[in-house]
UniProtKB/Swiss-Prot annotation:
Belongs to the NMT family. Coiled coil: none annotated. It comes from Melanoplus sanguinipes entomopoxvirus. It comes from the Viruses. Its EC number is 2.3.1.97. It catalyses: N-terminal glycyl-[protein] + tetradecanoyl-CoA = N-tetradecanoylglycyl-[protein] + CoA + H(+). It is an enzyme of class 2 (transferase). Keywords: Acyltransferase, Transferase. The keyword DNA damage does not apply. One of its GO terms (molecular function) is glycylpeptide N-tetradecanoyltransferase activity. The keyword Acyltransferase applies. This is Putative glycylpeptide N-tetradecanoyltransferase. Adds a myristoyl group to the N-terminal glycine residue of certain proteins.
Amino acid sequence: MNYWESKSICTVFTKYNDTEIINKIDPVKSNIDHSLYKQYTIGYMSNFNIVNICKFVNKHSNYIFDIDTFSWLVLNPFSDPSFNIVLYDNDKIVATIVGILRSIKIKNEIHKIIHTTFLTVDENYRKQGIHFYIIDKLMENAFNKGVLLGIFSTMKKIKKIKCVNVQDTYIIKSDSKKYKENNNVFDYKKLNQKNDDLYFIYNDMEIEYWFNKKYCHIISIYNNLFCFLKIKYKNNENLNILIEQYIHNKNINKYSIPNNSIMFSQYIQLPQIKLQNQIYTYIYNLNFNNLKCNICMF
């Protein structure tokens, strides 16, 4: 059985010509046998190994990070060190995954969430299920810190997942009086409406940190901020990838674009941004009592 298919807790059926999403709790035990990976050692990213990890990610991914930008993203002050995992085969790095702690708003309720990124596996170790193994390990660590949800985005829809929400993502400034935080449970029925947007909630300190002009190209339109990460592609072409949006007012609608969109470095005006593809956002929930049951997928 496909890994993600076993994590799905959605059913989809067609009524008249419309597809209706019905979410129901249907936990399935992991189909990944963790004992298969006992030869590997789990480590964590720090100032002592960050240079070697950056070299590994650059070698085995499509993008090229300088060490300062990579450290700024990974060793941020908001995430727990246990969310940044390195997998070793003896002393050799074979895989990495990074989880950035964020807050999201869905249906006027705030939840802590792990935003997964830098999932990288050495080419010689692929097709062994290692990426699923370290995803499980990351979410176990998150669960132990009281975080129930994870999220990731991809340019390609995962065919084996029965149902998925495609959501535009934005940033809004935190307002504790307007929204309530709930980190104990997550009502899966909130995802039944596909047109519900996802909002990242940032406080002043987080906005100051993530909208950093040293590492990002910032565009401001109608008091709305768009933050593009300065980065290089393997063909040496400079790119800016949209990683954050701070939507301050509703006049931005015609300019709204999904996170992870690519802007080529020669463009300076927002309407000239070229979208690479639609972004599929996947939210998954740790809905179990026994950690061995792993992740249940929405």
